[in-house]
From Swiss-Prot:
Keywords: Aminoacyl-tRNA synthetase, ATP-binding, Cytoplasm, Ligase, Metal-binding, Nucleotide-binding, Protein biosynthesis, Zinc. A motif ('KMSKS' region) lies at residues 622-626. It holds the Pfam family zf-FPG_IleRS. GO terms for biological process: isoleucyl-tRNA aminoacylation. This is Isoleucine--tRNA ligase 1. It catalyses: tRNA(Ile) + L-isoleucine + ATP = L-isoleucyl-tRNA(Ile) + AMP + diphosphate. It comes from Burkholderia mallei (strain ATCC 23344). ATP binds at residue 625. Zn(2+) binds at residues 908, 911, 928, 931. Its cofactor is Zn(2+). NCBIfam families: ileS.
């Protein structure tokens, strides 16, 4: 460079190293993202990731299947993007982390769609064919939506619960749990939807407010003498009266068969204008007020003394068909919070009622069960036959009144069970169903299903940790699992049952395997068309095909069997490392998967469970059509970019509710721009840098460059620890701070002078570029799991010879000698710089200086601050971005200060520094000596910055 002096002539404009990059400032995301999606598919990027990951330890995130019905909504986007971030971050952490997406394909919602389109009278074979076609069409539609969000996975070979192999394996799983002795058939009250005409799983029930009649009903004394003795009386002072119950379901009264009292609650005999009334003593005052009566307690007794007393059915006077009595059974579940402390018991329509009546010797055939599957009473029911239970409610109230049994009738607003699909009220209804027994021991002995599942919960890692207690409580308190459904489009419970006894065929296990083989070839349709004689010969005279299908929660709940160890066993493995779903899946997929794996394997199918919250608007309200506050992910992707949705999800603490609004998206977009601008600066300043030829070893870097790389490496270690625990929002927060403050607000700000004004190939500039290269290598990789489109776009500019960033692992930064001490020193220097910046700002406000380069500063410092500042020598001015800087030692911290003065020297046209040597070379009157040297001689020497 020394021979340049000969060529030096005055120039109209002196060159600086201002470089450009094909990485644009504007992301133009809605236009460019779909091109990346196409590019990834065309070049087989997912397959390349798999090839690059081969032989590494596996990490399996098992996809909880969305239902193959309808467009994807924001909740889907949250779920799929979180999964994508987990999978990408695990791949980059050095695992082989495949992602096989899946779909739940059977069940009611699809049947409803087929009914809507084609009516209810289609033959079964046509329902099946149309349901398969519909599910396929929905899957393709959803698949496009998921890919548009930047989610990479095995889209060409997803799992579907309706694939023949999966259907067959599900039947085999059923065979296994029968073999282990968990399955039984019984009459039991189950959640029943009249519109579905089927039992519902717990997860298919939601609660909504509704108003129902609330009535207090008198059951007249049937055994007055025994009642008197129970109360310690010789006889009752009068014959009229009885025991009083309170209910919000008048429709259950025709099926009443018992009364429940708490053994330890004290019951009172109250003398009133309506006769003698029996109720809990602590409810007397409230009830008298409600009934408009005055009453006097004449005797008291604990509930246990009233056990087995009988009272007349309250409709006995209305119709001879109700001339029966109801016995008193004791139950610990009776409370005195509301009502009378007496519960009327219709065992066909309440779980506790059923359990209590069965415990007192009632058989299935004794149970009165007049409500049919469509919600109507059987025709033979006295007074109300043929009516729906809802239409019958007011008529039952009228009949009770006419019979003299009604004490009070009001309307009552309460939270009540509804079908999640039809949004209509449901009931408990005793039906003959197939169950998995929660308190059943397996055939070979050992722990019950409930005990095994609770142990499995204890052995599982939960993110966030409160999920453990929630799932534990659900398993501890849940009833037996109703496995059967009364539908067509579902995997059959392919049993042959005895026409008279209902017993399973003795060869059931062998027959299930035969059916599974046929289903493997032809799908579940094979069972529909099967003639029983083909498999059981003349036994077909005694046995018939069971018509029930499996609960769809069994379909998805056995994917650990028919996907992880079935259709996709080559890609996946059991148990999965992680299941990741919304918090509603504690009673849904997490729950059913846990129960099936506990039955099949005696353990959970997952090592960890991650739960995310639901989306709400900016005011914390749930998204709903009525509020009009829903946000469509397609619309946001097409307007702002899927990257903005991804960044919003990554930056939100998903363990709670995820708030979204236009204001929030605006803030996210601004945050995105800051990151993008940082990347653009890095790429532009590396555009003339070839690492192989131009990089310097760390020992030759300037001190601030060593600090920057040491700091970036330390930050990366923190980020990877967050990634390992699936904590994304701290990753985003720290990276945004890194880009805006550590890089933009400090390091890159200091670096600009050296990058722009040093000779292009000078050691000072190459030192800066080498550091920037390492920072960019690291930064793009830690951004890639959530800013996938942007990281890939930047990577193609940065490393054009590389196929994709997603085959990379996290960057191994070069070792920096004394990194810890270096970071501590520069943290101190940045602290001082903050004080100087403040002083410069005050001087600017007072119009003493224009830009900071117009200033010369004197920093008075003590102790370690002085040592750190003094060690920079003349380079201190570059760190403070002033034209001159001196440091003066003082003894005490209290004497420290920053003095700012305006420079009296002229301004260099090229570097904008105010220097005494501007114009020192007559041929270049507007250049300072530093710029002259950098342009025409050997260039300035720097050591620190």
């Amino acid at each position: 460079m020394s021979n340049k002096k000969a060529d030096s002539k005055p120039q109209a404009k002196y060159p600086v190293n201002l470089l450009d990059t094909p990485f644009p400032m504007r992301g133009d995301l809605p236009k460019r993202e779909p091109q990346w999606v196409e590019d990834w598919e065309a070049r087989g990027v997912y397959e390349k990731i798999r090839a690059a990951s081969q032989g590494r330890p596996k990490f399996i995130l098992h996809d909880g299947p969305p239902y193959a019905n309808g467009d994807i909504h924001l909740g889907h986007a949250v779920n799929k993007i979180l999964k994508d971030m987990v999978v990408k971050s695990r791949n980059m952490a050095g695992f082989d982390a495949p992602y096989v997406p899946g779909w739940d394909c059977h069940g009611m919602p699809i049947e409803i769609q087929i009914e809507k389109r084609f009516g209810k009278s289609l033959p079964a074979a046509e329902v099946m064919a149309k349901a398969r076609a519909y599910a396929t069409e929905q899957i393709e539609k959803q698949k496009v939506g998921f890919k548009r969000l930047g989610v990479l996975g095995e889209w060409g070979n997803p799992y579907k619960t309706m694939n023949f192999q999966n259907e067959a394996e599900e039947i085999r799983a059923l065979g296994k749990i029968i073999e282990k002795g968990y399955v039984y058939r019984g009459l039991k009250p189950v959640n029943w939807c009249f519109d579905c005409g089927s039992a519902l799983a717990e997860a298919e029930v939601e609660y909504k407010d509704r108003t129902d009649p609330t009535i207090d009903v008198l059951f007249a004394f049937a055994e007055p003498e025994k009642t008197a003795h129970a109360f310690g009386l010789a006889e009752l002072p009068r014959a009229e009266g009885g025991i009083v119950i309170w209910t919000t379901t008048p429709w259950t009264i025709p099926a009443n068969q018992a009364l429940n009292l708490h053994p330890e609650i004290v019951y009172a005999l109250v003398d009133t204008e309506r006769g003698l009334l029996v109720m809990a003593e602590e409810r007397v005052e409230a009830c008298m007020k409600d009934f408009g009566l005055t009453g006097r307690v004449i005797a008291r007794t604990p509930g246990e003394k009233l056990a087995n007393l009988r009272f007349h059915h309250p409709l006995a006077a209305a119709h001879p068909g109700y001339k029966r009595t109801s016995p008193v059974y004791l139950g610990d579940y009776v409370t005195t919070d509301t009502g009378t402390g007496v519960v009327h018991s219709s065992p066909a329509y309440g779980v506790e009622d059923f359990t209590s009546c069965k415990a007192h010797g009632m058989t299935d055939s004794d149970i009165i069960n007049p409500v049919m599957g469509d919600g109507r009473y059987i025709e033979s029911l006295p007074l109300f036959g043929g009516l729906t239970i809802w239409d019958a409610n007011p008529k039952i109230v009228d009949a009770l009144k006419a019979a003299g049994s009604l004490l009070r009738n009001e309307r009552y607003a309460h939270s009540y069970m509804h079908c999640w699909r039809h949004k209509t009220p449901i009931i408990y209804r005793a039906t003959s169903q197939w169950f998995a027994g929660m308190d059943t021991q397996p055939a070979g002995g050992g722990k019950t299903l409930r005990e095994t599942a609770l142990d499995a919960v204890d052995a599982t890692a939960f993110y966030p940790s409160w999920g453990k207690q929630r799932l534990h409580a659900m398993i501890a308190n849940r009833p037996d699992w109703t496995l059967s459904r009364q539908r067509q489009w579902g995997v059959p419970m392919a049993f042959f049952v005895h026409k008279e006894t209902g017993e399973l065929h003795p060869r059931t296990l062998e027959l299930l395997e035969e059916v599974a083989k046929r289903v493997e070839r032809q799908g579940i349709e094979a069972w529909q068309t099967l003639d029983a004689r083909e498999l059981i010969g003349d036994d077909a005279n005694l046995y018939e095909k069971n018509r029930d299908t499996l609960d769809v929660w069994f379909d998805s709940g056995t994917t650990h069997w028919h996907v992880l160890r079935g259709s996709h066993k080559d890609q996946l493995q059991f148990p999965a490392d992680l299941y990741l779903e919304g918090s509603d899946q504690h009673r849904g997929w997490f729950h059913s998967s846990l129960l099936t794996a506990s039955m099949l394997d005696g353990r959970a199918p997952y090592k960890g469970l991650l739960t995310h919250g639901f989306t709400v608007d900016g005011e914390g309200r749930k998204m709903s059509k009525s509020l009009g506050n829903g946000i469509d992910p397609h619309e946001v992707a097409n307007r702002l970019g899927a990257e903005i949705i991804r960044l919003w999800i990554a930056s939100t603490d998903y363990s709670g509710e995820l708030a979204i609004s236009e204001e929030i998206l605006k803030r996210v977009t601004e945050g995105y721009r800051r990151i993008r601008n940082t990347l653009r600066f890095l790429l532009a300043n590396l555009s003339d840098f070839d690492y192989a030829k131009d990089a310097l070893p760390a020992g030759q870097w300037l001190e601030i460059d060593r600090y920057a790389v040491a700091f970036a490496a330390q930050l990366q270690a923190e980020l990877l620890a967050h990634y390992e625990k699936y904590e994304f929002h701290p990753v985003v927060a720290k990276l945004q701070t890194f880009c805006s403050e550590d890089l933009g607000g400090f390091y890159l700000d200091v670096l600009k002078d050296r990058l722009y004004t040093s000779a292009p190939a000078s050691p000072a500039r190459r030192s800066a570029q080498t550091a920037l290269y390492h920072v960019t290598q690291g930064l793009l990789r830690v951004l890639a799991p959530f800013l996938s489109f942007t990281a890939e776009e930047a990577w193609r500019v940065f490393q054009p010879q590389s196929d994709t960033i997603f085959t990379e692992t996290y960057y191994a930064y070069p070792e920096i000698a004394g990194a810890e001490a270096l970071i501590a020193k520069w943290t101190l220097l940045r602290d001082v710089r903050g004080d100087v910046t403040k002083a410069l700002e005050e001087a600017r406000t007072a119009n003493r200086i224009g830009s900071s380069l117009q200033a010369q500063v004197e920093v008075r410092a003590s102790g370690a601050r002085y040592d750190a500042l003094a060690s920079l020598g003349d380079d201190l001015k570059f760190v403070l971005i002033t034209s001159a800087a001196t440091v003066v030692k003082v003894d005490a911290q209290g004497d420290e200060s920053v003095d700012v003065a305006a420079s009296t020297y002229p301004k260099c046209e090229r570097c904008w520094h105010y220097r005494e040597d501007v114009g020192a070379h007559a041929d270049h009157p507007t250049l300072c000596g530093r710029c002259f040297s950098n342009l025409f001689e050997n260039g300035e020497t720097r050591s620190a910055a």
